Regions:
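Long, contiguous binding/interaction regions
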Residues: 1-69, 75-98
C-alpha cells in the first residue's frame, strides 16, 4: 500500500473514531454491514471475526447470487474495538464495509 493511501485510511479511521465517540455511550450496540462476493469462504470469514461476541448475524444473497450482504449486530466496548474489527475484516477479498 502506498503512503498516500495509508494516510487516507488512517485519517478515515480517526474521523470515524471521533464520530463514534461523539454519538455513543460505551459499551454500545453497533451494527456492522458488509457486502462480500458469494465465493469461497467469504461469509464464513466475516462470521468468524465475530465468534464468541454474542453477535446477531443476518445474511442475504443478492438476486443474482454473486454477492451476500452480512449484517452483524453486536455489543462493542468502545470505538477502537469497532475500528479494530473493520481492519480485521478488511483483508477479506472483495469486502465492502457500509
Amino acid at each position: 500500500m502506498d503512503q498516500e493511501k495509508e494516510n487516507k485510511t488512517a485519517e478515515f479511521y480517526e474521523r470515524l473514531k471521533a464520530e463514534l465517540d461523539r454519538s455513543n455511550s460505551w459499551p454500545a450496540e453497533y451494527l456492522f454491514k458488509f457486502i462480500v462476493p458469494s465465493i469461497a469462504d467469504n461469509v464464513e470469514r466475516v462470521e468468524s471475526a465475530f465468534d464468541c461476541m454474542g453477535a446477531v448475524i443476518k445474511t442475504t444473497k443478492s438476486k443474482t447470487g454473486k454477492f451476500t450482504s452480512v449484517s452483524v449486530d453486536v455489543q462493542m466496548k468502545d470505538a477502537q474495538e469497532i475500528i479494530d474489527k473493520y481492519i480485521e475484516v478488511s483483508v477479506i477479498e472483495g469486502i465492502v464495509s457500509l
